[in-house]
């Protein structure tokens, strides 16, 4: 019945195939044979209580560099359809999986907040990670920590055990919408 913080940086399996960097994919991953990065940015709700101590806009800015660049993402395709992660990575446009790096949920009689961002290593050298860690702990210890979504322990466990299939969705040709029209 308590609150649990799961720091899963480097330990996630389901989502491991998606490479995130701070800078978004250049133009189109299918043209570059799915070479990384695979994401086109992040989406966050800047009014969420977690971000009172980690100010942000609805997208990434420079304060996110340390947390996003080369961070692992989690894939949520096995979570409830309405589920929204607190920090949602935006997948490449033609695959559009639900992926993210931080979520909160009700689980059994307790509440969990899980992140795949590295918020704990070398806190003396990483002020951004240290501040995000503090913001998370303060949020979880407040009466504002009221997750909207419910997931099962198995759904969380599958983030560490499940693997996604390979995606080979690149082309040797131009996408149809960019081909010249020949009469």
Q: Which residues fall in each region the model found?
A:
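Short, hydrophobic alpha-helical segments
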Residues: 136-147
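A short acidic/glycine-rich loop-to-helix N-cap element
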Residues: 120-129
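A glycine-rich, often tryptophan-bearing local segment used as a flexible ligand/cofactor-contacting loop or short
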Residues: 2-69, 128, 132-138, 153-161, ...
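Hydrophobic targeting/anchoring helices
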Residues: 116, 146-147, 160-166, 170
């Amino acid at each position: 019945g308590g609150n649990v913080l799961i720091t899963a940086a480097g330990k996630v399996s389901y989502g491991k195939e998606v490479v995130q960097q701070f800078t978004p994919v250049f133009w189109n991953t299918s043209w570059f044979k799915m070479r990384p990065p695979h994401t086109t940015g992040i989406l966050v709700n800047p009014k969420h209580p977690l971000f009172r101590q980690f100010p942000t806009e609805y997208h990434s800015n420079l304060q996110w560099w340390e947390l996003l660049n080369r961070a692992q993402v989690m894939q949520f395709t096995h979570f409830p359809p309405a589920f929204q992660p607190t920090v949602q990575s935006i997948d490449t446009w033609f695959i559009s999986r639900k992926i993210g790096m931080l979520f909160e949920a009700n689980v059994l009689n307790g509440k969990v907040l899980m992140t795949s961002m590295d918020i704990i290593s070398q806190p003396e050298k990483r002020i951004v990670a240290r501040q995000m860690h503090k913001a998370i702990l303060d949020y979880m210890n407040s009466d504002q920590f009221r997750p909207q979504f419910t997931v099962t322990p198995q759904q969380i466990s599958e983030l560490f055990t499940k693997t996604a299939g390979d995606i080979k969705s690149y082309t040797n040709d131009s996408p149809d919408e960019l081909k010249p029209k020949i009469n």
